[in-house]
């Protein structure tokens, strides 16, 4: 199946540490619901979780990109998933980009365990989501 890829940036979901931008998430949900109304096929969109959009100062940019920071990233994406759980157009998520966003983890050999923890975080309440590796 061909998917439409929609980027979702951590700094838009959680612009300050442990503070989620509910207005952004409501806007994302409204956009996805509108697309459903306008004919988007069910399970046709994959969200592409990215680290930083490049806009403004992002609190996590100065942090070491380690497993602990990746857990915070995962929590933010899980929070976003809760806000859009009723959007039928969402098929799931691309797996995080370990070649550019999380290169330190990839070099440390932690990519596979981080991927598994990312998927496991979603399994309990979002088991219907697909997870697709980058090519």
State where each predicted segment sits.
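Aromatic-lined substrate-binding rim segments of carbohydrate-active enzymes
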Residues: 2-58, 62, 111-130
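Active-site region of glycoside hydrolase catalytic domains
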Residues: 67-135
